[in-house]
Amino acid sequence: YGESSCPKEVIKYDIEHLTGDLVALLDHYQYKDAIFMGHDWGANVVWSMALLYPERVSKMINLSLPYQDRGEKPWLDFMEDVFGEEYYFVHFNKQPGVADAILDENVEQFLRNLYRKNAPSQGPSEGMEMIHLAKATKPLGEPIMSAEDLSVYIAAFNKTGFTSSINWYRNLNRNWHLLATASPILHQPTLMVYGEKDLIPPLPNITDFVPNIDIKSLDAGHWIQEERPEELNQMILEWLGK
């Protein structure tokens, strides 16, 4: 999505293709390896890059999303068992096109409601969370970016729609199978930064899978790099300088 070619095939968004793009960049610029950093889905790609191409990753910096243990059950099936079929990961897969259309009809409203901080806690509600965000006329909390910055995202998604970004979720079980033969232990030096107000919980036993990890946190929600840019940059620079 964004300024990419936005391929239509769902499979083009699986972890094999996403990590393959990074390998292609390394090869193009003739780099043996690199330090990779990602946030949320970007962190998922970085973790997977280290699983599939460990020799191409010298260090990792990941924000918000911890390492995900593969477990014994495909991820989507596990999520449906735990959270139900209205959980947005599951909904995207079991009701293809439904959320896509609603988000596409409410681009500005959805993004305005998504990119917020310090929103008051909301109790569980019926229906699908992302659809609620797209339909909510009154945003909660405070914006994490200026109206000018937000307009860039609005223009991008008005151009492409949301299906391409949702296709990342539609490869969840496929990714589980693609990672079946990868060693689950990552030995690269790693910095993991959590937002203390983020709804995504830390992985308690992350050191079982990433033994060479430094775990930090900042007073922020999910959008750490937007909420605490100076503190995060300083934390990263200090870690890289160790």
Question: Where do the PLM segments sit?
Answer:
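Catalytic active-site module of serine/aspartate enzymes centered on a nucleophile-bearing elbow/loop
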Residues: 213-242
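Flexible "cap/lid" subdomain of the alpha/beta-hydrolase fold that forms the substrate-access gate
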Residues: 3-37, 41-213
